[in-house]
């Protein structure tokens, strides 16, 4: 391999690294919908094990953290899939005070679905 071939390989490798870093920043794709008393949050996280995903709600901020290990025996030619997801999302709802826990969370086929109870306020009795 000559100098031009080596330089081309290094440039493509650097582009791949920057692309992966970009995807780690913008991913994962997220959908949210209001369903009665719950906010349903759907997050695409293929390639991550359920045990490696950490979720936390603090106020109306949902934090998603995931990390996966990859073992490669050969030479990496192209590498774009993210190893790490560290995302904070502002939820469009008020979460019930003291119930910052997710109502339910399911992870199946690389898709994480959260059901988060919403706050309705308190009825006021008139005397």
Question: Where on the chain are the PLM-derived regions?
Answer:
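Alpha-crystallin/small heat shock protein
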Residues: 1-127
